[in-house]
Design a protein with these regions (language model features):
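Conserved alpha/beta-domain cores
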Residues: 1-142
Length: 142
């Protein structure tokens, strides 16, 4: 198995090649190191290699890692987010990638207003309309 540095170098090379093929600048793309279920020591090693954007899929795990890892990490919520957990991450995340309902968006807005912050989000759309998948239906989009 490749070590973390070799793996990161390979991913970076792949990103650079994809950017070149697409006529894009490397700076147009954000590499997010997905940290879910990984130990703190491993995340610190990855951080030491350069990445500053980390993705987490569980609020509690994200909050625990935020407490002990460097404060300049930009955290991304990449998993399903329950409305009762929004208050724990608003104002602490770079981007919420998985807003899958109007109800959730309204809760994010409510918590953001309480903290006087702006929250960047991505809306998750269930294009395939699969019942087992999260996301709003395409008819609900503007």
């Amino acid at each position: 198995m490749m070590d973390l540095q070799e793996n990161l170098q390979q991913v970076e090379a792949n990103i650079c090649k994809a950017c070149e093929n697409a006529g894009r600048k490397r700076s147009d793309v954000t590499l997010i190191a997905v940290s879910k279920t990984k130990p703190i020591e491993m995340l610190q090693t990855v951080y030491d290699l350069g990445p500053r954007d980390f993705g987490e899929n569980k609020v509690q795990e994200m909050c625990e890692k935020m407490e002990v890892l460097p404060k300049d990490i930009r955290w991304h919520m990449i998993g399903h987010l329950q409305t009762n957990k929004v208050k724990y991450i608003v104002g602490k995340t770079e981007l919420i990638h998985s807003v899958d309902s109007l109800h959730l968006a309204k809760e994010i807005e409510k918590q953001a207003a309480k903290q006087n912050v702006t929250v960047s989000i991505l809306v998750e759309v269930n294009i395939a309309e699969e019942e087992s998948k999260f996301g709003i239906h395409k008819e609900e989009t503007i």
